[in-house]
Structures are given as structure tokens and as C-alpha cells.
């Protein structure tokens, strides 16, 4: 198994631009023989999104972009960092995109709340681990 780590300059609030960078990195990673690529934390929306997370239209745009990514990236498994809204709660999440769909989503457990980090203000802490299968490996 060859794993690629996408080192991207994600721009806060530029969901469409960040999605395009994720696709470009996935194409490059696949061309180099990777079967799995991991993107940075909140790569879809940029970090730290702060008060953008309080806007429903921003979260809607992230959801739409993630769905589009899942269908656009089909030949490599990609783990994408993004905000994930569930009801009234918002999670700092990472979703696994595989075979044209979202197969799993992880919610970050340990949210920092010091110095410039204020994640507890915006996110709910997750409570479950995530294990997924990739080419028969868990």
C-alpha cells in the first residue's frame, strides 16, 4: 500500500478552490502509484474557519463540495478534512472517499481550546473511533 500525504495551501473560505486542489493532488498521488491519500485537517474549508462555521450557507457549500468530490475521485481512496453538520451540531471531521462515495466519517475527539485555537467554541467533540477497510487492510 502506498500512502500519499497531500501538503496543500488551503485557503480559509475558498471551498471550491480547495476542492479543486484536493482533486489535483489526488490525480498526482494516483499517478505516482498511491492508493490512499490523506489531506490536511479541514482541508475542504481551510483552517481555521472560525465564524464561517456559524453560517448555514457555508456549511451547505461544504456538504455539496464533499459530495462532488466523492463522485469525482474514484480511482484512489482519499481522506478529506471538513466540517460536518449533524442536526444542530458541527464536528471537525474527516471522511473517507472510496469508489465514488463517502464510506465513513470520523469526528475529532480532542478539541484544542488554547492560544489561537478555539475549536470548542465551534465544534462538538466526537466520541467514536473509525476503522475502515482499504484493499483488505483495516
Explain the meaning of each model-derived region.
Residues 1-138:
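Enzyme catalytic cores with a strong preference for nitrogen-chemistry domains
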